[in-house]
Amino acid sequence: DFLYGMVTGTSWVLVPESVKFNLTGKLPEGVYARDLILTIIGEIGANGCNYQAMEFTGEGAKTLSISDRMALCNMAVEAGAKTGIFEADEKAIEYLKEHGREPKAVYHSDPDAVYAREYTFDLSKVRPVVAKPDFVDNVVPAEEACGIEINEAFLGSCNNGRIEDLRVGAE
């Protein structure tokens, strides 16, 4: 694909369908974005958004920190998605400005956008969860994993290597 683009100056890209995830409410204390995305993947399956875009929207989306939003978008691939996106809001624009990247344009979904599917998740009902071996959609409540001895743990990677994650792990 890369060589073809260099030679012809063109590229072929299939624009993915969008799947809308309307988020309501607010995550309870001690519940994190990874609990939310694992809950979503547990419901829709590891292939639930194959070659699609996961669009996170709604009043609940606005309550999530930028770090939480990054975690959801990063893990969208675990549901087979090509991308995960949030609608640009004041919090996102302010984050960009604070990091020297004022947006040149802000885009929003069309009011009459057509989605392949739509889901609603009440953030206040999300509970801590874990994905058991061997699949990311093998999601169970965290209390079902209590009592399992852990010899090693890794906090890092693109999924949970932000300073917020390290602080929680240190507690």
Region locations from a protein language model:
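Fe-S-dependent hydro-lyases/dehydratases of central metabolism
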Residues: 1-171
